[in-house]
Amino acid sequence: MRIAITRIPGKGAGDARICQKYGHECYTVSPLRVELYPDRIREFVDAANRGELDCIFFASAVPARVMGPLLTSPPRVIAIGPQTARTLAKSGIRVETLPAFYSRALVPYLGEWIRGRRIGIPRADVPNPALITAIEGAGGIPVEVRCYRLVPTGTPLATDGADALLFTSGTSFREAAWTPRPGLLLMAIGEVTAAAMREGGAPPAVVGDGSLEGTLGALDRFLQGAGR
């Protein structure tokens, strides 16, 4: 299948290789672009390099790409997935990867270690109160910095040549300009995105585990079940 994948411009590196592995091809469509907050980034990095944080949790490759080269004395660093981990590793940072592709896996992963620790969370200008509440409930101290925002591009998604459209976040779905059409298979990268799509009246036929590979595996199972 030919799959249109929602990505921030420049963030889709490696997608084609992964899709080819599963016998598909893909291209990027961008409903959002990134706008950085440089002052907030510098303040956060300086605090980390001064030892004021016990851990940094990167839930996206965007802050990892920007902050990684600036972290000269990083604390414990945890990435939400392998792509984010690889981005950090390029800067020579020793990084751990969560066993699941969701922020909610962070607190169980840290266990008792989190108690009394300052957990840095560089993220988009989109609230995640559930993560903050979970950290506080486990005795940790969340230090959240909204270091960039996602700005709608307003560009209609080019899906005329696609067999499937994969949304990679709830925000990308909510902000996308696109037109449903018969024959266009809708996909969600994970359950959070799927929930946003269902709420928006566009339920996905395929739901992944939060990763591109997991989604393509789910797609292949769907196609086999449909006899395609």
Where are these regions (language model features)?
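Signature of uroporphyrinogen-III synthase
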Residues: 1-228
